[in-house]
């Protein structure tokens, strides 16, 4: 079957030279695509997890009794929401990256302790996290004050009320908006190619650069793969949203 597919795309290339699906009949190029796919998955999963954590913590800190803490969180939100994620990525990697400590694995080459993949995760997580803070804040405000007052009457601390009462309800209310933000985050990971992160788009552009006849196939495959990835995420989030829905909240 694999040999049949390989021969099929070789024949297509002979008939239509501008449609060279080289990654289907050249194992080396296929390996590059597979590597890019897994880097994209790893980058996306890491950014989703960290951005949600940032959103949860930031939303809680927004309710702090200390004005300084609230101002710091608000400043963070304004900075990351009002500057392009591409500029943020370059700032983290080139501006802050020069201060990163290095180590020498072989006693000769100096390597920064935070790689380009690490900086991409940090930058994109902070970017998406700023939106998640506002999403979770809106969810928290949707929880009736009487619910919080009841938990406090039971002797719960502010942190316990947030963890066990407010956040579970707020999370359910926030899921639709969170879904949209995470979809945008997955699409934004393609910008990591600017700092040479070998994700999916980077690998396809490299193949196109090495084999100009693979231009149309490369862009077509990127388009199809991202439709699939985003489609799976949207479907999963919608299923999760329905499973966690509570009558009377977020409807």
Task: Place the predicted regions along the sequence by residue.
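Transmembrane alpha-helices and adjacent helix-loop boundaries
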Residues: 1-251
């Amino acid at each position: 079957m694999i040999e049949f597919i390989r021969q099929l795309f070789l024949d297509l290339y002979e008939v239509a030279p501008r449609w060279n699906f080289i990654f289907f009949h050249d194992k080396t190029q296929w390996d590059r695509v597979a590597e890019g796919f897994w880097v994209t998955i790893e980058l996306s999963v890491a950014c989703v997890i960290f951005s949600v954590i940032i959103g949860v913590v930031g939303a809680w800190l927004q309710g702090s009794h200390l004005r300084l803490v609230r101002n710091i969180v608000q400043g963070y939100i304004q900075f990351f929401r009002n500057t392009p994620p591409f500029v943020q990525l370059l700032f983290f990697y080139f501006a802050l990256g020069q201060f990163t400590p290095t180590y020498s694995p072989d006693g000769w080459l100096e390597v920064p302790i935070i790689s380009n993949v690490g900086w991409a995760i940090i930058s994109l997580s902070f970017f998406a996290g700023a939106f998640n803070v506002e999403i979770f804040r809106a969810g928290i405000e949707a929880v009736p004050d009487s619910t919080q007052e009841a938990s406090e009457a039971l002797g719960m601390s502010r942190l316990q009320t947030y963890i066990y009462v407010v956040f579970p309800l707020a999370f359910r209310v926030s899921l639709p908006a969170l879904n949209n933000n995470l979809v945008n985050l997955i699409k934004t990971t393609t910008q990591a190619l600017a700092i040479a992160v070998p994700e999916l788009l980077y690998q396809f552009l490299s193949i196109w650069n090495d084999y100009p006849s693979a231009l149309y196939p490369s862009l077509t495959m990127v388009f199809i793969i991202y439709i699939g990835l985003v489609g799976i995420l949207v479907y999963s989030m919608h299923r999760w949203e329905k499973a966690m829905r509570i009558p009377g909240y977020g409807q």
